[in-house]
A protein has these predicted regions:
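Short, surface-exposed loop or secondary-structure junction motifs
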Residues: 2-7, 59-270, 274-275
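A short acidic/small-residue loop/turn micro-motif
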Residues: 4-7, 293-295, 413
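Short active-site loop at a secondary-structure junction
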Residues: 8-71, 106-118, 189-192, 283
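Hydrophobic "lid"/C-terminal helical patch
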Residues: 33, 204-208, 306
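Short, well-ordered beta-strand elements
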Residues: 274-292, 409
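Solvent-exposed loop/linker segments at secondary-structure transitions
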Residues: 249, 284-285, 309
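Short acidic-glycine loop/turn motifs at beta-strand connectors
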Residues: 171-172, 253-256, 280-282, 348-351
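Peripheral terminal and inter-domain segments
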Residues: 240, 260, 281, 297-419
Length: 419
């Protein structure tokens, strides 16, 4: 452990400090769902409405046909960055799911991978109904307790019994404590609230690498469920952040043999970020929890060092610009959008530039910014965010009748063309 829990108090971080783990929570929600699939209380391929009869999104056909599998592998097409606060009562997840009735599709059901936070809250509600309890109680009873990780917390009043880290925002050298300590509790199954120490996350990874058996010898998941979570369901078009998705799990093929051998997830909340990678073949796992600064750069370096040294495999380098590559600018120019904001691809001083503008509800998470794009392949571009060195990929997909891209895929999300 290094650094401090809070720059205003100067309290040092320790191996026992709890950090917000963000979307690493999705691994836990998927594991809960798979436990209930194993007992027959949930079905991966049955309509969500079999469990939640009144479930609805804006698209009536999707409301009827959506399955748990679509939710866990991010192929629902639901515009998933929907962070409305449904309160703090024990019915908060249920209330949140009701709010989805007006949420539209980014793409048709099952059409492609596009990261969907809302889908995991729906899965959390299915867990509640199937298990007859709240998601918070289910995760403590079914995962935290058998794993032997009692400090794993899903509510602030649980976490305050331990040492906690607070998030920090701003640039390195000018960081300040985040004005918002937590995201909405109603989004907890997607990762808004849970807190854990790095050891807790590694314990979960060890369970997954051991076919569902925790380090303390307790069987947490059937081996078949772990295997299912590690199987490719869908590939990610912009292969930089991840290569493919399983059931709640991200997959990587670092050695290029066509098989996925590294698993895990990333997470972020306001001012905190987390990374988990594990390689069952070598029994190597790495967790990094941060509460400010350029955590992404540290994570990239640490992942490379740990897995090159301990597992003998090295992460694939991101795509690089290709000099002289012909670009069909008419294909990519235009506005792309989803609930979280818009990306305008414009021409400026002879260059293509992606101008990111967050929606009003997302301004606290990310400021407007522009990224110069350089061609790296057919429909593939790379650019570097301000303050970072590792490039981001922009993948322009499919074509409409005018030969213009229908979708822009970046940050593991699809944005549909708006203009």
């Amino acid at each position: 452990a290094a650094g401090v829990c809070n720059i205003e108090t100067g309290v040092p971080a320790t191996p026992d400090t709890l950090f917000q783990i963000g979307s690493i929570t999705k691994l836990y929600t998927a594991a809960l769902a798979m436990q209930l699939v194993e007992t027959g209380k949930l079905d991966l391929d049955a309509p969500v409405r079999d469990t939640l009869p009144g479930f609805a999104v804006a698209d009536a056909a999707v409301s009827r046909r959506l399955t748990l599998r679509h939710l866990l592998n991010h192929t629902s097409g639901i515009d998933g960055d929907f962070f409305k606060d449904a309160g703090r009562g024990e019915d908060r997840v249920e209330k949140y799911v009701r709010l989805l009735k007006d949420v539209h599709q980014v793409h048709p059901l099952g059409h492609m991978f596009s990261y969907c936070n809302a889908g995991f809250v729906v899965a959390g509600r299915m867990i509640e109904v199937a298990d007859g309890t709240t998601w918070d109680r289910a995760i403590r009873k079914r995962l935290a307790k058998p794993l032997g990780t009692p400090a794993f917390s899903t509510l602030p009043e649980q976490a305050m019994r331990y040492q906690m880290a607070i998030g920090h925002v701003g640039q390195p050298g000018a960081l300040s404590v985040t004005p918002i300590a937590y995201l909405a509790q109603s989004n907890a199954p997607a990762g808004s609230m849970p807190m854990a120490c790095a050891r807790d996350i590694i314990t979960f990874a060890r369970m997954m690498m051991s076919g569902g058996v925790a380090p303390n010898g307790t069987r947490v998941l059937p081996a078949g469920s772990v295997h299912a979570m590690h199987q490719r369901n869908v590939t990610c078009p912009a292969r930089m952040n991840i290569d493919a998705a399983g059931l709640g799990t991200f997959l990587w093929d670092w050695d290029g043999d066509g098989r996925y051998e590294v698993f895990g997830h990333d997470g972020s909340t306001i001012g905190q970020a987390s990374w988990l990678r594990y390689h069952p073949q070598s029994e190597t796992a790495m967790a990094l929890l941060t509460n400010g600064g350029n955590g992404k750069g540290l994570a990239d370096d640490l992942i490379r060092e740990v897995f090159t040294g301990a597992a003998g495999i090295t992460p694939v380098e991101p795509p690089q610009p290709v000099a002289g590559l012909a670009v069909d600018r008419a294909r990519v120019l235009g506005r792309y959008g989803k609930a979280s904001g818009t990306i305008d691809v414009i021409e400026k001083q002879g260059m293509l530039v992606a101008v990111h503008k967050p929606a009003a509800d997302f301004a606290v998470l990310q400021a407007s910014h522009a990224i110069a794009l350089q061609p790296a392949g057919d429909g593939l571009f790379v650019g570097t965010m301000p303050g970072f060195t590792r490039p981001v990929t922009y993948h322009f997909l499919e074509a409409n009748g005018a030969g213009r891209a229908r979708y822009l895929h970046t940050g593991v999300r699809a944005y549909r063309r708006m203009a």
